[in-house]
Amino acid sequence: HIAHHTLPCKCPICGKPFAPWLLQGHIRTHTGESPSVCQHCNRAFA
């Protein structure tokens, strides 16, 4: 529980704390951005 309070990065949208390597993926939950797109059907995936 204490580790949750000492995480160094906070989401600029909702303020939740995250480790640096998880923050970018979390921000995608707010923006709807998907990093990968299928070349065959153009469907986006995380």
From Swiss-Prot:
Keywords: DNA-binding, Metal-binding, Nucleus, Repeat, Zinc, Zinc-finger. InterPro entries: Snail/Krueppel_Znf, Znf_C2H2_sf, Znf_C2H2_type. It is found in: Nucleus. GO terms for molecular function: DNA-binding transcription factor activity, RNA polymerase II-specific; RNA polymerase II cis-regulatory region sequence-specific DNA binding; zinc ion binding. GO terms for cellular component: nucleus. Belongs to the snail C2H2-type zinc-finger protein family. This is Escargot/snail protein homolog.
